From Swiss-Prot:
This is UPF0344 protein SaurJH9_0969. The keyword Cell membrane applies. It holds the Pfam family DUF1516. The lineage of its organism: Bacteria, Bacillati, Bacillota, Bacilli, Bacillales. It is found in: Cell membrane. It is a multi-pass membrane protein. Keywords: Cell membrane, Membrane, Transmembrane, Transmembrane helix. It comes from the Bacteria. The keyword Lipid biosynthesis does not apply. Belongs to the UPF0344 family. The chain crosses the membrane at residues 1-21, 36-56, 67-87, 99-119. It comes from Staphylococcus aureus (strain JH9).
Amino acid sequence: MLHLHILSWVLAIILFIATYLNISKNQGGSPFFKPLHMILRLFMLLTLISGFWILIQSFMNGGANHMLLTLKMLCGVAVVGLMEVSIAKRKRHEQSHKMFWITMALIIITMVLGVILPLGPISKLFGIG
């Protein structure tokens, strides 16, 4: 399940950037916008489902830092929401660059939290998790 989660969020980030850049300020969405947006939503849903599954497994197994897991879950849900809001703002021709960069910063924070959690690579490297 961890591999599905990592694959889905990597593809979601790539699709988010592609979808965001496929909206022109003058002409609106390109012909590729709607399929990209639908595929992005699919991968965001896969990310959320696999993330909740990993969260439930970590809570049941014990030994995990529940506060960091909950914080990462909240950041992940916020990232998905901010992705949708920034794409919607750009589609309505509103100022969306600030929202885009806030979303990217929150993506990085969420990734850092995932790296330091018990299933992350740093925890495995030092034998913590």
